[in-house]
From Swiss-Prot:
Organism name: Mesocricetus auratus
Positions with biased composition (Polar residues): 1131-1154
Molecular-function GO term, any one: ATP-dependent diacylglycerol kinase activity
Name by which UniProt lists this protein: Diacylglycerol kinase eta
PROSITE patterns assigned: DAGK, PH_DOMAIN, ZF_DAG_PE_1, ZF_DAG_PE_2
Amino acid sequence: MAGAGYQHHPPGGAAVGTSAVSPTAAGPGEDSSDSEAEQGGPQKLIRKVSTSGQIRTKTSIKEGQLLKQTSSFQRWKKRYFKLRGRTLYYAKDSKSLIFDEVDLSDASVAEASTKNANNSFTIITPFRRLMLCAENRKEMEDWISSLKSVQSREPYEVAQFNVEHFSGMHNWYACSHARPTFCNVCRESLSGVTSHGLSCEVCKFKAHKRCAVRATNNCKWTTLASIGKDIIEDEDGVAMPHQWLEGNLPVSAKCAVCDKTCGSVLRLQDWKCLWCKAMVHTACKDLYHPVCPLGQCKVSIIPPIALNSTDSDGFCRATFSFCVSPLLVFVNSKSGDNQGVKFLRRFKQLLNPAQVFDLMNGGPHLGLRLFQKFDNFRILVCGGDGSVGWVLSEIDKLNLNKQCQLGVLPLGTGNDLARVLGWGGSYDDDTQLPQILEKLERASTKMLDRWSIMTYELKLPAKASLLPEPPEASGGFYMTIYEDSVANHLTKILNSDEHAVVISSAKILCETVKDFVAKVEKAQDKTLENTVVAEAVANKCSVLNEKLEQLLQALHADAQASRVPPGVGPAIPEEDAVESSSEESLGESKDQLVNDIAKPSSQKAVKPREIMLRANSLKKAVRQVIEEAGKVMDEQTVQPCEPVSPSCDYDSPEADDSKDNDTKESPAAKSTSQAPEAQAIRGHFQTDSVAGSAMATTKENLPVLNTRIICPGLRAGLAASIAGSSIINKMLLANIDPFGATPFIDPDLDSLDGYSEKCVMNNYFGIGLDAKISLEFNNKREEHPEKCRSRTKNLMWYGVLGTRELLQRSYKNLEQRVQLECDGQYIPLPSLQGIAVLNIPSYAGGTNFWGGTKEDDIFAAPSFDDKILEVVAVFDSVQMAVSRVIKLQHHRIAQCRTVKITIFGDEGVPVQVDGEAWVQPPGIIKIVHKNRAQMLTRDRAFESTLKSWEDKQKCDSGKPVLRTNLYIHPAADLATEEVSQMRLCSQAAEELITRICDAATIHCLLGAGTGSSVNACSHALNKANPRFPESLTRDTATEIAINVKALYNETESLLVGRVPLQLESPHEERVSSALHSVEVELQKLTEIPWLYYILRPNEDEEPPMDCTKRNSKSTVFRIVPKFKMEKAQKQKTSSQPGPGDTESGSYEANSPGN
């Protein structure tokens, strides 16, 4: 920065009196009030320039475009910068002949402000300051790292860790302070009322801007090498010492030794540990315990002494004995209006800076590579749903699914996954992060289903509409009645056990079909000029008659094998029609059916599978005739169009005939209804008859598909008309084929040949209306990021875009452009604008779009760990808005395990996955299960019980129990009996771990469900095993007891929880026996006074009146397992369970997400 004597600046030169402010907004709190005092008198700055030829001879470390703040009204202009040696050069562009140069010998670099929304930073030299602005935060971090490497004379590598993590250099940023603050370099107060200056984002080291270059490199330790001579060595190895920082203590600071007030607002005095946050007087410092306990977050911290070596790839290798369950933190610095920057700094202050990473600076790969050698670790992602998906995808690439559990801290806009896992919809207070880390330590683990979005791009002809236009609906209205009648009576024939109902429905069905054919023939006579359409209609009517005759023959064969009381109506009189031969055969078949039903017979009954196939064939034939009839009615009012599109046959393929070796349909009819290109498309989508029959035979031995859908026999118009009524409940599952052989079942459902994985879905998938709104919002955010920097603004934009779609109705006929299949079964769609596929019960920012969380008579309760998807319809934006306050259910479509969506036409359709939207070209989209991820869910029941116990302890002792005090004094030794009991408990736990590992080789779910508990318990046991019992202290014994108890609860919940895990016979007895042994030993441990309240809360003694009320029926720490109670009840039916045995033994059932 120029002094007062500097009178001239060239265009684009350094600014006079510029301050560290944002280029978009500068508040008074961001201005540097000590700018003039820092110079120590006027100094004349001589401008130094170099030619491009002189610069070319030096090696370039980094170069590129940056914005530079100028002297005229603090405007920003683009300049080209080159860092070569310890000099920074800049000019208007890279081809300029003259470059200004800045000497970096005594320079320091600092971020411009606290939130730093515009990625600006300042280069501070004794003579000038350069305010620069990068395009994104990663580029800013790269420039700062390269400038620091020049100062430290260390090689700069972007691909590895930032050098400041290991060099001890401070990471400066400009900020103001609310109270008097002192410089840690010159010990003088920071200038101005707001004490504006530089602060290290990791260790809170304070400095004037002029003093920053003279600050010692004593930032927070990261590795064993950074500790240096302060390391503590004893007979057990190395120990973690305190790392003290002098002065600037809070007003309420008290000495941990003498319990007196320490610190001062008048001078720099007294000390604070950067790890355990203990504060001491200078005189008391030597009296304090030298070993640092790491404080409140010790479980999550990787101690610097643990990072003591590097592997062949250059990554640090951790010593596992120091880390039970370390925490890896990923922060998206852009999330929450750049609130991520504040959380990034706060986590570096609480944890080891080497375990905190910015997703915007290198992504998650670097952190996962550092932690991949750990047997068990936790991950905390601070950001939105997109950040979580990014980290999970990288976990898949490194194959770390079994080693890590992932938690979410919501900083984004939607945060649907965080809501479901119990972490809330938003989080803005960085001062509460220690409490968040505590809750994360007490969280339970649940499995999250993850789904692959497989795409196959293929241009398909436009899908023919099954519904005539409303103006021409006079004839179509009657045809709709016909089809509804056929579907209704077919359902009665298939489901009714009363023969009188079957006879009546068969009679009405015959009359309806004959009348329907006659109506179609009359409509056909009016369009004889279009021979192609007329021939198609005639062929379809012929096929319809054949299908009805086949159904009657199947019923006739079934009637010969059953006894039914007589009571038959009169024969149906024949009617004149064009197909007279077919009419006569139908009448004869019907009369024969009526007569045969009344005759007793002892022959074996025909399989109902054949009747089911004939009924489905008849329904398809009716639908095909309606398609052709709809085109005929279009010909009456609209000008003649092209021949019938063959793509309509795709909706109802004739696969059932090939499966039953039924060749009654004439080849001429098929050749007429299918063009060569349609046959090619059909061949691409379905297998041939041989493959179909083979697949059908294999599916006959499989259990019934767990697919719950709306009746596939319903037309789109019928489904739309009764969408909100109770008829859906009655028709649900009506026509699902229990033999797995309906013609709608895809015989090659699991084949993904030719498909590519577009992305992975964790939350939800949307196509149509909601995806269009998300796509427009994402485009708006990319064009104007300053308008979308807060959740409130984002919600307002969603409202504006949704209102616009309410008027435009861009996808009002989406059912005509897409086709939906659930578990291979075709789903007729009502009139809708979008389809949503849900994996979690939270959609678009907290909406329960499924409309409930409980099981009913039709659908199962939605869950994100059942490998089942929920499919719902999106009718309009009003429905999406109303569903935020009202639980709507009329738009439910299905629950299934796979979803297939076919996009027809030439134009793409908007698609979104977890809020990320794009335009998907025509083709096929398949949603199939990929894998499962371990997610950390907040366990409020356990937190409540633990808080009640802590309150009870406070009431008994009369003062709060500080967690850090447990580690200040040496742990007490155990008595002989206590050592013996701990030995037996450890042996029982080791036996249980062995049995679980043996069973997990066959039952993967057992290993996934207990993996974290097994690892934690093994680490706790290994601490005491090398020198047992000498190495056993109360702290170690307490840790062992807690981990053994957690393993017991986890295993019990899997064996006897809401969905018990079925093990094979030998493994089940072994695991149960080992679990019972652990239960007995845990009961013995409750006799030890200092372990009683940890393993079993006191339910008999009520707390004093001034204490928080405890839940006396809490079963979080209940020892007796549920399966033991059930076994005792079977043996002694007269015994009654106790009041504490009426609840489930698994506290996970009360956790969010269930």
